[in-house]
């Protein structure tokens, strides 16, 4: 007696019920698999994104906000910090590399980041990987031009403050022309989604998010001079400009810092300028906590470890993942109950068939196995379809995810937990079929073979 042929026949006889219950199992498994893939993929990408960012320094506020703004081009900047602090860090013997960033504009939603050529020449966004050009060159940078831009921005700020107080304003002298002031190097995703090409000009809008009310800097168009190769990090979704050009445009006037430094940190030299944040790479990890404490003891700046902040973030959102996973398990449980009810309801129609099998020599254990195997088969097929479906859904969504975030989730990677999900489906099928199987086991042969009156 071939049990699988009998099980297949029974499933075909109840095709609609089998399809509905199997689909319920598939949906539950697909949801669970998709949640696991997305969680692991997003967490892995976020953690990889911090590899080149050993320490981030910015204005006092939320460390997580600072990390999201600097490393991932998300959220808004907590504020500005002193350029003198950057110079101090750059000259610190414990610091291997210091890279300044200034933000405040966007082009079609892509963050515009003011920085120096150090970002392209020395910065590694991952160990051993620097931003590489697919076309063109990097922008020209000269520190003298940056200091001139700082002075110009400070003069504009003083003029604005004088106007606000109703004082007579003496126009500042026209700044000296700067060679190649408005050059930009764009990430691969920016080039792909905006259609910008090498040598093309574009006009930025004020603010880090696109808005219909945002003022466009029509007087200062930037020229694309370079396009970066894909990195599958936030670098792909950014536009990098010369830091001095950032302060040449209106709306980026230099104002007084929001918090003064400690008295012992003050000197008679005026602060030449400000930046949004500084990324620091240390000569050795042993210097990390010492410098971290020094920066956080200041009243005008704070330091954050991106890797630690991202771990905290996923500790928080992990509760949401567990809730979604619990919902997926609940769907599986409901599907299991539906399987049990479906088979149980069909037992009244199948009692005579079972009695005939018994009369032909089938043992009680064989009948029990047939019903139990039917429930397990429905769950296994549904779970297998759900497993494949979960991966297909994530793979199909990767196109949208890449456009929105610049990275993709490895949809073909099978996690260990997925095999546990399949095991749970088998156990669930066995439990679902246990009640109907016991009913079949106890079927009275004589009564069910007797002719109905």
PLM region spans:
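Short helix-loop junctions at transmembrane helix boundaries
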Residues: 384-424, 434-447
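Internal alpha-helical transmembrane segments of multipass membrane proteins
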Residues: 23, 321-342
């Amino acid at each position: 007696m071939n049990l699988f042929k009998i099980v297949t026949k029974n499933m075909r006889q109840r095709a609609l019920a089998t399809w509905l219950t199997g689909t319920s199992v598939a949906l539950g498994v697909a949801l669970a698999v998709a949640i696991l893939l997305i969680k692991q993929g997003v967490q892995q990408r976020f953690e990889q994104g911090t590899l080149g960012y050993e320490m981030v320094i910015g204005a006092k506020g939320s460390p997580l906000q600072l990390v999201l703004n600097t490393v991932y081009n998300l959220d808004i900047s907590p504020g500005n910090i002193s350029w003198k602090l950057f110079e101090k860090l750059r000259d610190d013997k414990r610091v291997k590399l210091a890279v300044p960033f200034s933000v405040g504009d966007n082009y079609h939603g892509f963050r515009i980041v003011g920085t120096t050529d150090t970002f392209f020449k020395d910065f590694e966004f991952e160990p051993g990987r620097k931003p590489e050009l697919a076309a063109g060159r990097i922008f020209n940078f000269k520190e003298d031009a940056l200091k001139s831009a700082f002075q110009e921005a400070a003069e504009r700020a003083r003029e604005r403050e004088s106007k606000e107080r109703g004082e007579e304003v003496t126009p500042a002298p026209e700044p000296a022309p700067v060679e190649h002031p408005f050059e930009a190097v764009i990430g691969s995703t920016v080039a792909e989604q905006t259609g910008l090409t090498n040598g093309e000009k574009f006009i930025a809008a004020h603010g880090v998010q696109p808005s219909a009310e945002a003022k466009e800097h029509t007087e200062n168009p930037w020229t694309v001079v370079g396009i970066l190769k894909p990195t599958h990090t936030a670098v792909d979704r950014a536009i990098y400009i010369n830091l001095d050009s950032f302060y040449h445009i209106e709306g980026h006037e230099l104002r007084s810092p929001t918090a003064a430094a400690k008295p012992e940190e003050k000197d008679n030299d005026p602060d030449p300028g400000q930046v949004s944040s500084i990324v620091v790479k240390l000569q050795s990890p042993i210097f990390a906590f010492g410098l971290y404490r020094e920066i956080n003891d200041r009243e005008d700046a704070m330091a954050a470890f991106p890797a630690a902040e991202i771990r905290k973030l996923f500790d928080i959102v992990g509760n949401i993942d567990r809730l979604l996973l619990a919902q997926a398990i609940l769907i599986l449980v409901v599907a299991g109950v539906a399987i049990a009810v479906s088979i149980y309801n069909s037992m009244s129609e199948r009692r005579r068939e079972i009695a005939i099998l018994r009369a032909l020599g089938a043992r009680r254990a064989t009948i029990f196995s047939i019903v139990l195997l039917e429930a397990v088969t429905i769950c296994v097929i549904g779970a297998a379809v759900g497993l494949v479906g979960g991966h297909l859904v994530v793979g199909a969504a990767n196109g949208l995810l890449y456009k929105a975030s610049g990275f993709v989730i490895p949809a073909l990677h099978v996690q260990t937990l997925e095999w546990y999900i399949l095991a749970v489906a088998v156990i669930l099928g066995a439990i679902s079929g246990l009640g109907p199987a016991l009913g079949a086991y106890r079927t009275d042969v004589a009564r069910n073979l007797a002719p109905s009156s």
